[in-house]
Amino acid sequence: MMRNQNLLNYIKNVLEHMPTDWLLLTTHRLDIYNEEQAKTEFLNQLDSLFETKVFSTSALAELPTAFDYIRLGHPLSSILEWTIAGLQGLQAEQVVAFASQTMPVLSVLRKNLLQHKHTHIYYSEELPAEFDFEALKQVYGYQFEVKQVKHIEDVHSFDGSTVFLSKTASFKTLDLHPSIDFLVQLDEELGSVLVANGDSSKNYIPDIQHVRRRESIAMTPPNAFAALQKLVGQTPTSHSKKEEQANRSSVINSIHNITDTSSEVVLGSCGLSVQYAIMMGLIDHAQQNYPDQPIKIIVPPNCYGGTND
């Protein structure tokens, strides 16, 4: 209990003294990036700073880069995962923060489809409208059952994976019931956090990270910052919807100007996620409009790895 309070106090100081580019950066510093160690090196040095109670801006700025792309992760998402894991007595790798609320579930379903393993998805509160389970079955071919329960204690383990979806005001208190393999903590404004619960779930982590890397993005720097503020009991810095809309309009105008078109623009979190959405949207369209026709995907041999995926 004392260590948890010390951890939260330390995070308060980190948020107060962190380098400004942690929140605003769009490109990582590769001069302090070691690809072979990457996030491990970042967390090891963060551990050392925590143990020695060092949180100066200069010390935090010298922490090595954990990822080579912002969409894969960044200092604030890494610290969020590290903090949640520390509060729960878990390893940092067991916690994965997503910008999306649905992608954590898809990452487990994808792994289980390849492993020919069934999945039970439980929830107690009303789910966000983004969860279209019928589409997941029809378009992706995922095999799972969805069950609503009153309490987390009503979840029963079976010879497969159990996923529990929870909505909360904070990521601080997680109910890791032993019958749950994966807890997905949802925040409608910030994204979600997936926790791999128990030793048997740890071998899913590379596959979960793979989906976040190739088909989605990590929780964004501003949202990870807000989540950390919630963790330490602070009121999250207000996010201006007006500013967000202005930025969105600016991007759309740029697209219209560059392409010399006036067609509708749909924006995504990153290039790979847009490609992914286009591909799965085409499959969904084909299934609905040409149900008796086979679907074939042609991938050129020199296609970029992420697109191949």
Describe the function of each predicted region.
Residues 2-106, 110-309:
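Conserved N-terminal alpha-helix of the aminotransferase class I/II PLP-enzyme fold
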